[in-house]
């Protein structure tokens, strides 16, 4: 009996000795962690000027040394209904949820992959065909190589796929047209390569659509259920979901995006296209029409606090509090720049050369990594300065500047606030 008791005590002590307790975020004043508060405050006026000039809204949060030192919202979550300015626009708050667009790639798909790699359930050198049956070259394909594509090739964006096949738009997609998830997977298999794999980088949504399907194959769960139940819920995140309107959230909690659906103010048309102001539905066309709102490349919504926790997980080397999702070796593996391009890690964008200045500014360390999203979102994680910045915005919630010339340029996209690096530099420049 004594031996059993002693053994139990020793085992408990042994396990507790190896338990990892990761830092959790607390709130501190900027001065407490090395910022000049007066300099940092200047950013407030500059962002407000951008809002006054027509930028819809900006939510900003800054982390330094495990502390939230700045969290603020400017502008409006919804100011238009169609082309009509609302008499009483809805103000953005620090709790407003935003369509993350391509930041979904990192904080849903990459987080899931990093967890699965750490758990030994997948290897980045595995062939894609191991998880997606029928993923192979098609008769008549001019460029061959699908059979040999590895997950690491997909993550590095060197797999040969086009940037945006526009599956839901039959006028563009042609035989690859799809507005259902099951058909979309078959169309991805049939999508011809545009260049020889490994010969160059082409940032492609298709790559991350494939990765989403791979995660579902391994886990036997829909992507949204997997990340929401095994990552977000254990972290205590309450505002990070796919398809928020189907999960208890209401439009006033969410920032609106494009004014006239996906029509770019009336110049784009295809079957089932949305025409009302988008509010609580993912903006991305492939994610909405072709994937039902849940895709590896887009579809995730979140707020700045939840994003701060996810960025802190990365700064911590894979955990938060008493929760371990992956380890520091996995973080290093995924954020190390590729041999071919210093600006690409495994999915993550890395501050590897001057081409990333518009994203990360000129003052962040070369080891900084993160991602951007088409709707106006940025995440920047700097392990050298133990610092992270998240900017969430709803840039498409403004008129298209000139629909006939370029339907993808919005009036707000012409403002300086659309260049994240300037904001990032003002934050770094406020360090003492």
From Swiss-Prot:
<keyword id="KW-0812">Transmembrane</keyword>
<dbReference type="GO" id="GO:0006508">
    <property type="term" value="P:proteolysis"/>
</dbReference>
<keyword id="KW-0472">Membrane</keyword>
<keyword id="KW-1133">Transmembrane helix</keyword>
<feature type="transmembrane region" description="Helical; Signal-anchor">
    <location>
        <begin position="7"/>
        <end position="25"/>
    </location>
</feature>
<keyword id="KW-0121">Carboxypeptidase</keyword>
<keyword id="KW-1003">Cell membrane</keyword>
<keyword id="KW-0645">Protease</keyword>
<keyword id="KW-0378">Hydrolase</keyword>
<dbReference type="GO" id="GO:0009002">
    <property type="term" value="F:serine-type D-Ala-D-Ala carboxypeptidase activity"/>
</dbReference>
<dbReference type="GO" id="GO:0005886">
    <property type="term" value="C:plasma membrane"/>
</dbReference>
<comment type="similarity">
    <text>Belongs to the peptidase S12 family. YfeW subfamily.</text>
</comment>
<dbReference type="Pfam" id="PF00144">
    <property type="entry name" value="Beta-lactamase"/>
</dbReference>
<keyword id="KW-0997">Cell inner membrane</keyword>
<protein>
    <recommendedName>
        <fullName>Putative D-alanyl-D-alanine carboxypeptidase</fullName>
        <ecNumber>3.4.16.4</ecNumber>
    </recommendedName>
</protein>
<dbReference type="InterPro" id="IPR022849">
    <property type="entry name" value="Pept_S12_YfeW/YbbE-like"/>
</dbReference>
<dbReference type="InterPro" id="IPR012338">
    <property type="entry name" value="Beta-lactam/transpept-like"/>
</dbReference>
<dbReference type="InterPro" id="IPR050789">
    <property type="entry name" value="Diverse_Enzym_Activities"/>
</dbReference>
<dbReference type="InterPro" id="IPR001466">
    <property type="entry name" value="Beta-lactam-related"/>
</dbReference>
